[in-house]
Amino acid sequence: MDWQTERGQVLDSARRVVIKVGSAVLTSGNGLDVGVVDNLVAQIADLHGRGVDVVLVSSGAVSAGRAVLRRCCEIKGMPHKQAASAVGQSRLMHYYDEAFGRHGIISAQILLTKDDLRSRHRFLNARNTFAALMDWHAVPIVNENDTVAVRELEFGDNDSLASLLLNVVDADLFINLTSAGGVYADNPDTNPDARVMECIENVHGLNLDVMCGGKTAVGSGGMYSKLLAARRAAQLGVPTLILPGRKPDAMLRAFAGDEPGTWVRPEKKTVSARKFWLAYHADPTGSVVVDDGAVKALEAGKSLLPAGIIGVEGGFGRGALVRVTSAAGAVVAVGLSNYPAADLRRIMGHRTAELTAILGDNQYPEAIHRDNMLMDAVV
């Protein structure tokens, strides 16, 4: 199937959509751009009327708070940013609530940190909450809980949060609204002739550092993070549509076939929801370095055995999420380690038959089982 046919079929059949909108779309120099917000809400109401469930991931709290506080307070450092978020979040939600109310739609606020999705029990609670809200035909409005999040509990940006929610709500489409017209084939800041790519066939094959100038250059929430989120969505089998968020009715025009944006195709071989959760529920706490033979075995679908390990980095415990890297430093996979780092250092390079003599009875033959590993993880 060609991508145009795929896109048309998905847009016609989509029944659950995660829409992400960032601060660059929602705000102007004077704070919240109410015209943009009103148009966004009107488009979501239109989709709602067609029977499409929508989860809205919305940034803008910090920017809205800054607009209120700038006359009296200087905002600098993380505590001030978190305080500005507290001021802005209530104003942002108040406006959303009124805007959706004008269309007869109930909105609901959900604030999350990584810790809320790290525990399988809390992950399932979150899933049930979203399901109940959508059964009531409400629109969940999600943001990272900036006020309480610390570095190790941050999603990093709302693009990452939105990609993880695809798995929570079983979405069949991811729409990412940006201040650009879509994804450019080259950096438009340095190449004025750069054009928007209407389709990305293989998002994993893109060199993001070249296209986006690297993560540092574009900053949190730039095109770099949007394409990383699209990579995760593609692994889950969910296509991504990147659209110009400040352009009036861009989503409705896209559903009508009149607004191209950039369509990111999903992978043909997708990962299970469980593996997706295992790989992305937490940040890796260490690394296991493997030889070329082990890399080939993993690519063939095998588990990682201690014999293929040539190095261990970090001080993680049993069951921790770790990176699997090649000798050259490339990330091959992430997975849950059957052994703490100290034990892995003792058994690395040894054959399975030797493990009992080194560590005692009842040892796992695998350092990381293939069922607990995700290849080509986006970390």
UniProtKB/Swiss-Prot annotation:
Substrate binds at S59, D146, N158. Pfam families: AA_kinase, PUA. SUPFAM superfamilies: Carbamate kinase-like (SSF53633), PUA domain-like (SSF88697). Pathway: Amino-acid biosynthesis; L-proline biosynthesis; L-glutamate 5-semialdehyde from L-glutamate: step 1/2. It is found in: Cytoplasm. Its main location: cytoplasm. Its EC number is 2.7.2.11. One of its GO terms (cellular component) is cytosol. It is an enzyme of class 2 (transferase). ATP binds at K20, S220, G221, G222, M223, Y224, S225, K226. It catalyses: L-glutamate + ATP = L-glutamyl 5-phosphate + ADP. Keywords: Amino-acid biosynthesis, ATP-binding, Cytoplasm, Kinase, Nucleotide-binding, Proline biosynthesis, Transferase. Residues 285-362 form the PUA domain. GO terms for molecular function: ATP binding; glutamate 5-kinase activity; RNA binding. The keyword Transcription regulation does not apply. Transmembrane segments: none annotated. The keyword Nucleotide-binding applies. InterPro entries: AceGlu_kinase-like_sf (IPR036393), Asp/Glu/Uridylate_kinase (IPR001048), G5K_ProB (IPR041739), Glu/AcGlu_kinase (IPR001057), Glu_5kinase (IPR011529), Glu_5kinase/COase_Synthase (IPR005715), Glutamate_5-kinase_CS (IPR019797), PUA (IPR002478). Belongs to the glutamate 5-kinase family. Catalyzes the transfer of a phosphate group to glutamate to form L-glutamate 5-phosphate. This is Glutamate 5-kinase.
